[in-house]
Amino acid sequence: YHGPKPHWAKIIIKPIKSAPSRLAALLAGDVDFIDQVPTVDIARLKNEPKVQLSQGVSNRVIYLHVDQFRDNPQYVKTHDGKPVTKNPLKDVRVRKALSMAINRKAIVERVMEGVAIPAGQLLPEGFFGRSDKLKVEKYDPDGAKKLLAEAGYPNGFQVTLHGPNNRYINDAKIV
């Protein structure tokens, strides 16, 4: 390393899995830095004179990946709970309907308390590889129902979603 002298003589990395414990350690002065601040605590931390918040856009995205390749997916059932004879997720209209049924604005405002941006692809604006052609799907439950009916599912179907829990901020709530 041939750059300027670092500002620290040593750094100790202390993994603290529990979000409340991380926050308590910061407020008690036991640690100097934490990441993954719970959204419910951001407003409070903004009023803490000894705390400086830093926010930025990241490439952390929670997305829905559906089982569109198997003929008989294990976690997809008919509207009345029977095994499917044809995978509805293979139909692009069904996948588009699922996307249209997600209220991204509500997720940002209610679940993430305003500290997120709606995602329409894996990379946010400003990241290499992002496509300006892919737009965030508008929330349109009526349009989603229409597409499901066109695809042959006027009564819908059942799908079990699996997702992380306590790996990312509010991940289980988002799912």
Regions found by a protein language model. Give the residues of each.
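Flexible hinge/switch segments at interdomain interfaces of large molecular machines
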Residues: 120-123
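Extracytoplasmic/periplasmic ligand-capture domains
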Residues: 1-111, 117, 127-175
